[in-house]
Amino acid sequence: MTEASAPLIDVDPRLLEVLVCPVTRGPLEYDRAKGELISRAAKLAYPIRDGVPIMLPEEARELEG
């Protein structure tokens, strides 16, 4: 599935309270439009597939900038 066709998924805010970036152990932000969890500190975007966050650095997309 491409980013353009990623389904809009609602993420439980409680999930964001307990999930952290596996690289930095820092907080994550949810990008609903792209269906990703964002680690600003690591500059990585972790995909959400079929409602499941894929928290593997090798599966993450590098953020530009």
UniProtKB/Swiss-Prot annotation:
Transmembrane segments: none annotated. It holds the Pfam family Trm112p. One of its GO terms (cellular component) is cytosol. It comes from the Bacteria. Gene3D superfamilies: 2.20.25.10. Belongs to the UPF0434 family. HAMAP family: UPF0434. This is UPF0434 protein CCNA_00107. It comes from Caulobacter vibrioides (strain NA1000 / CB15N) (Caulobacter crescentus).
